[in-house]
Amino acid sequence: GVNLYHWFLEKQGSYGVSVKIDAGDAAKKTVLPDEVPEVDLSAKYVPEGMSWIDEYHLQYPEHGMTGGFSFSFVLLDKNDLGQVVQDQNVIDSEERTFGKYQGIYLKYNSITENGAINQRIYLVCPDLYRVLMIYIGDDVSKDEAIKVAENLVIEGNTTMVKTAGLPTWSGEMISEKTEDDNAEISTSVNEKKLPIYQIGDTFDLDVIGENTNGEYLEKTISAKVDSVQISDDLQLLDPDKIPQEWAEAIDADGKLSTNTLNYVKSGDGIDSLDEIVKSEEVNQKLVYVTVTYTNHSNEEIDHMLYLGALLTLTKENGKVQLYIPTEQAGDGYDYISWTGVAKTGEMVYYSVSENYGNGGNYISSIKPGESVQLNMAWIVNESDLKNLYLNVTGDGASYEFSEYILKKGLVDIRK
């Protein structure tokens, strides 16, 4: 029944494509069963130096969590047949047979060759009622990508899973296209509505943790940003806690390397691609923040979650405007892309952690009247230092004014 299913790939303009799966009449009548087997995936060919880091990721270990292959199965339902999925910024595409499966290869335009996922292969596996979606990094050549896909072993095992509620091919692809349009995000606010604290100010904070019996706890404590230090190296950090990509961003003289900013004019993805209109080098700086949390409540808080997030804000005419450094448009360009490690948002480095929860950013215990001092750090572009604010509410918001930020405020750490 495999060859009853086929892909259609149609070009639109220079860089647009329409993709759909179709099938013979018999296949069109096939009803998706209530249960289908789980799928086991392996490969008879793995590029030299690559290894499986879990059952769905094949990567070069030295590239960390970027690039390589990422595999994802979705259901193939008869409603998926004939559904057209539009795609843009495609610079190479072909329909072909991969081993015993019909499939499509797509390569996308990517401004930075830096761990980007810039290729995809879709395979239809009708005997298992699945489509396999393979996302492939720019550290893999087209030939290697095709060779891996041709040598995949895709088999159902004895565990059955219910099909109700599982993602389907067209549902997944169409939701991917609409995801970005729905969210209402607040990025501008009247400055009277935004509480702002200075370095050295003490303010209240709601935190979550557990009591000594292991039960969920919400308490109000106080927080204070004691100091902010700016550095062009990583000497302030605990060497054991330095993220690998930061360590790799140090140049020969021990300083943070510069960041190449590419100013990009957007194409429409069909007749034109994004293009770099100018580039410049900027310095990257370490932002090292010391914060003290004090428990004023009458109860010990165990496994207290803490989280710092960095925002970039500008003020004008009584309005505070949040901007995302990469999303700034200007004269002749629509956004900025870069190769360095500079990044606002959630803290990347933090000095206190415990083996608990997701990410370990917990204070294991803070008794009534006790204070805990800790450090958080980011690397940012020097040009953003004059606009930095810190969110320690614990919600991690950095790309919008969340209700916690509007209630509990931000700390002005501009330099």
Where are these regions (language model features)?
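A short local loop/turn or secondary-structure capping micro-motif enriched for an aromatic residue
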Residues: D77-V84, E113-G115, D139-E144, D233-L234, ...
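Surface-exposed flexible segments
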Residues: Q83-V90, K142-V153, M304-L305
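Short, well-structured beta-strand
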Residues: S110-T158, N283
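Glycine-centered tight beta-turn/hairpin loop motif at sheet-sheet or coil-to-beta transitions
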Residues: H63-G68, N114, D127-Y129, Y216-T220, ...
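Extracytoplasmic/secretory soluble proteins
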Residues: L58-P61, F69-F73, A116-Q119, C125, ...
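Conserved functional micro-motifs across diverse proteins
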Residues: V2, H6, Y15-G16, D22-K28, ...
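Short, solvent-exposed recognition patches
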Residues: D25-R120, I276-K278, H303
